[in-house]
């Protein structure tokens, strides 16, 4: 006798068996539902040592160069009398000083400006920018090893923005050798080293940045414009001011003035001097005085205390 309930149970039972058999077969074939699949962990791509060796070599060159050069770089503090504060510091260079613009120290202290420099002889001669030390009645020099000394201003040259100072350390100092800035090529790697401190902070001292030579022989009219407005020089500004800057994209900021621009061979090829900026901070354009020009100025300052120029 036909029993509808029993028939329904049989159909359900056969359907369940068929489903389980089908599931077992598909699982064995690897057709598992995606919702239950284990995530596949990708293996890290293997890069051959040969492929990255040039980059590693360049990185190691930067490291070796920074280690070798930094001991010869110094931080400079130049104290100016209050009477000289607004007259001796050109507006175009004021952004390079640690002291905020328009903010002076008490009259008894004068104004302290910060900059950089680098030792060029074991007996303590140091190159820097004229605008870092001009008009100062007291100059202190700080080394990376925490030593510091009073410095004597040997001479300054506003027409090239080069200055020479000297310290007496009582022992030979680490010094940078001169490169040949005439041989520097556009696209060549360089390092810029200095002290981009802000607000008299030493927390950023001896910062190393890298970049390339972006251009050569840049005449910015920076020195001419500043000197032309100075009653000490008048029309001599356009006659004697020399602007032949090396341009770089290495980061240069306030306090870097006077620090070295160094080639990968470890030679100084320039003196960091200025930036082109609408904000007073780095925007991709830094400029350095070619070391060949600075060296000629230095030699005259050592011998005469000033730069001898031909006169007609």
Walk through the language-model features, giving the residues of each.
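N-terminal Sec-pathway targeting helices
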Residues: 4-16
